[in-house]
Amino acid sequence: MTTPLIEIRQIYKSYGNTPILNNVSLNVNHGEFLTLLGPSGCGKTTLLRLISGFEQPTQGEIFINGQCVNQLPPQKRDVHTVFQSYALFPHLSVFENVAFALRCKKTPNQEIRKRVFDALKLVQLESLAERNVKQLSGGQQQRVAIARAIINRPQVLLLDEPLSSLDYRLRKAMQSELKQLQKTLNMTFIFVTHDQEEALSMSDRIVVFNHGHIEQIGTPKAVYETPANLHVAMFIGEANIFDIQVHTVKDQDIITNIEGIQLSCKNTGNYQVNDRLHLIVRPEDIRVWSLSEVEKTEGMLPGRIVDIIYKGSTVDLKVELSSGKIINASEFFDEDDDKLEYTLHETVWVQWLPGWEVLLPYEG
């Protein structure tokens, strides 16, 4: 069995009487892109600072390559951090910002030049080496910060919400570049974000945080399609949630009632009659049918379209059910498909196939 590069063992962190992290344990593998995902104030950045050595745990241990590093200062941990603010030296050129750590070590000039240009080439900035960093765009400044962080080839690169200040288009481009850089370097990246799309598109695994606890650890597919609890389901993407009760268990299915309609669902949790559950279905898994398209309405819910949002590749619909509950549906847009020409206030039928839903124990 491969030894993890980083082991977080029962970490607690408090500031005064305020708990920030509560019994957090986590292993990080060699060459892994791991994302710490959660809302503001959940403890994810605090954990990053504990790994880097800028903070000390109140209780628990942190191991890097099998060595406990609790007492080691940041410069002894072979871990580098890219901060949200980039923390560049505004009076220095791109080259000198990247070379700074090497100059502190009194590295020979010839070696500095080679290593700096190697790092700048990886982030596609070699042509801007002599430019002052104040003359760069936000995306270019971020690349400089990354080049400076990888110049010594640390075992772990920690990234604290580095994309949050970029505009949407640049943020999307940088997501792809960061992932490709991580693969090229075969370096362990630990990435902090509150953005679910970033986490899903970049990560090998995602660690979902909430109120100082880890709620779930898994691949992007696992945390999206099989969330561990209601918080994960609601935080990762959009979710329509129905509170239901099991009426009948039949083979591998359960029968329940939603909006007065009897529906069949896959019994994925060995649930029993009278169990209260949350039924979760993603907007992209809901199908919306006009009245003229439907002959048999068994297993469908009647509704009325109350909003239509055109997004280019998709059409998002808000459908009001008979109880007044609003659910979201998302359809891929095809301009040649007349079936996607919905009208406001149109009466429709909505459905999803058994097994497309997620069932979770009721949380009250």
UniProtKB/Swiss-Prot annotation:
Record has Transport as a keyword: yes
Pfam families assigned: ABC_tran, TOBE_2
Family matches, as PROSITE patterns: ABC_TRANSPORTER_1, ABC_TRANSPORTER_2, POTA
Principal place of residence: membrane
Protein keywords: ATP-binding, Cell inner membrane, Cell membrane, Membrane, Nucleotide-binding, Translocase, Transport
Family matches, as SMART domains: AAA (SM00382)
UniProt GO cellular component terms: ATP-binding cassette (ABC) transporter complex
Positions bound to ATP: G38, P39, S40, G41, C42, G43, K44, T45
EC number of this enzyme: 7.6.2.11
Subcellular location field: Cell inner membrane
Ranges of residues in domain ABC transporter: 6-236
GO MF annotation, one: ABC-type polyamine transporter activity
Catalytic activity: ATP + H2O + polyamine-[polyamine-binding protein]Side 1 = ADP + phosphate + polyamineSide 2 + [polyamine-binding protein]Side 1
Keyword Magnesium listed: no
Bilayer topology: Peripheral membrane protein
Quaternary state and interactors: The complex is composed of two ATP-binding proteins (PotA), two transmembrane proteins (PotB and PotC) and a solute-binding protein (PotD).
NCBIfam families documented for this protein: potA, PRK09452.1
Protein name: Spermidine/putrescine import ATP-binding protein PotA
Organism, as annotated: Legionella pneumophila subsp. pneumophila (strain Philadelphia 1 / ATCC 33152 / DSM 7513)
Lineage: Bacteria, Pseudomonadati, Pseudomonadota, Gammaproteobacteria, Legionellales
